[in-house]
Amino acid sequence: MSKAYEQSGVNIHAGYEAVERMSSHVKRTMRKEVIGGLGGFGATFDLSQLNMTAPVLVSGTDGVGTKLKLAIDYGKHDSIGIDAVAMCVNDILTTGAEPLYFLDYIATNKVVPEVIEQIVKGISDACVETNTALIGGETAEMGEMYHEGEYDVAGFAVGAVEKDDYVDGSEVKEGQVVIGLASSGIHSNGYSLVRKLINESDIDLASNFDNRPFIDVFLEPTKLYVKPVLALKKEVSIKAMNHITGGGFYENIPRALPAGYAARIDTTSFPTPKIFDWLQQQGNIDTNEMYNIFNMGIGYTVIVDEKDVSRALKILAEQNVEAYQIGHIVKNESTAIELLGV
């Protein structure tokens, strides 16, 4: 590479070191179907080895949002990689798809190999947990686009599901039950408001909250639901699923419901993590609005027939997932969600 390019602000050698540092982490994620991985112009994946009759590919992309600012300010970068994967694979999981592979995009002011390695380690940890191959990525050094120390992370996930097993909500009916899977905390949404409230409160993020440092609570990575939900799908007919992200209950649960139906949710049927109480009190936020911003303790929902509820809860418990019967489906022409207890 020419000296002129390096003089323009791009550190080629730092990029090489970052690639070398991340390689061992990436190798941990490989699946037998991967033909070509990092290093080529395009990564390849052999769908014929999936033993599916009529595979449907499902793709999704997402970022981590301004949660990144907290991670950057406090030098904790590995959990952000987990968030990047979780936001993507949890989304495509709602169709019943098994995640197959993942690609990342990291853009930064200046490549710091140690930081890039931490991010990719987190990505790889999440990929290993969800059996998702990290088969490609891009690290872009753009000094004029970002302030010193800043970076952004985005992810891209592709999965597959048998055409006959595709979950689209079309089988949702009155009387079916909504099961909520517990979140790990705030996950990766609402952080513009979270950061505003942190700044207004003037709290010491190193101080303890609920027996943990505040910063650890705020940076707790998004929960990965792939393993427990796929295990559930093998045993129980799932009618619809939702990943509770930006917009909370109000914007996400209706996305999987046919017209004319609503999910009637009892907000007293599951515990709300204490951090949401802190946020609500700090911002003097109406309870109804909280459910329109945050996951409030439920990060993912599945809808099943009433006869399958006990079995579903048992399977999820065996997968070490806290789950609750949080509501049921009713006929409603005017709204797609009814929240009780707010």
Swiss-Prot record:
A Pfam short name: AIRS_C
UniProt GO MF annotations: ATP binding; phosphoribosylamine-glycine ligase activity; phosphoribosylformylglycinamidine cyclo-ligase activity
EC number in record: 6.3.3.1
Keyword Cytoplasm tagged: yes
Superkingdom, taxonomy of origin: Bacteria
Similarity section: Belongs to the AIR synthase family.
Protein name: Phosphoribosylformylglycinamidine cyclo-ligase
Organism whose genome encodes this protein: Staphylococcus aureus (strain bovine RF122 / ET3-1)
